[in-house]
Amino acid sequence: MTVAPRRLAWTNARQSYPVRVAHVLSVNLARVRANPDPRAQSKLTGIDKVAASEAVMVRAPGSMHAGVGSGLVGDTVGNPKLHGGDDQAVYAYAREDLDAWETQLHRTLHNGMFGENLTTSGVDVTYARIGERWRIGSDGLVLEVSAPRIPCRTFAAFLDLRYWIKTFTRAAKPGAYLRVIAPGTVRAGDTITVDYRPEHNVTVGLVFRA
């Protein structure tokens, strides 16, 4: 059954996250399935993510059209014309924002439910600056914040929520795409350290709302 969520009470004000060590809560890989959007060009989708039990290799996937799609080995991009590639190699979403959506939607949202590769904790992803670099774990992995996620029909169909694209857009909590600066492995529990933060104030949320 398709459910229309209530109007969000969120504002665009910065959210106060509990003080904790920023870390990767879950690393999620695609469980390939039929695309739930009957109008989609691609008949398969990788939006359905499940937690990986071991470390996952992350490397630059190459161009969107000619590369391997996702930056995570073992992950799958269903429509390489719109997703994946070097500038969308990894998608991160904050567990804190998923928790807020659970309250809003009155349903459980497991890690990876929004199609994110990395479910983070202690990171305000919306206020990450474009060009900001994250060092993750101890294996040399460095990622750079590149862009916000733009919701698509497959996302809405996967969650089976009417008006989801408008609802998600209005909330302005899009999560962030990241490019791979230095390859390495990532696993649940790895710390996230901001290695570099640009002096500008262009954040993921600002670009999303532009």
Model feature map: region roles:
Residues 146-168:
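Histidine/lysine/aspartate-rich catalytic loop segments that bind and position anionic ligands
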Residues 191-196:
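Short hydrophobic beta/alpha edge segments that flank linear recognition/processing sites
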Residues 2-137, 141-154, 200-210:
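Electropositive, beta-rich accessory/interaction domains or terminal extensions
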Residues 107-115, 160-173:
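Short, basic/aromatic beta-hairpin or loop at an interaction surface
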Residues 131, 183, 187-189:
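Loop/turn positions that initiate beta-strands
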Residues 120-122, 175-182:
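Short alpha-helix capping/helix-loop boundary micro-motifs
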Residues 173-177, 188-190:
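A structural signal for small-residue-enriched, beta-sheet-centric alpha/beta enzyme cores
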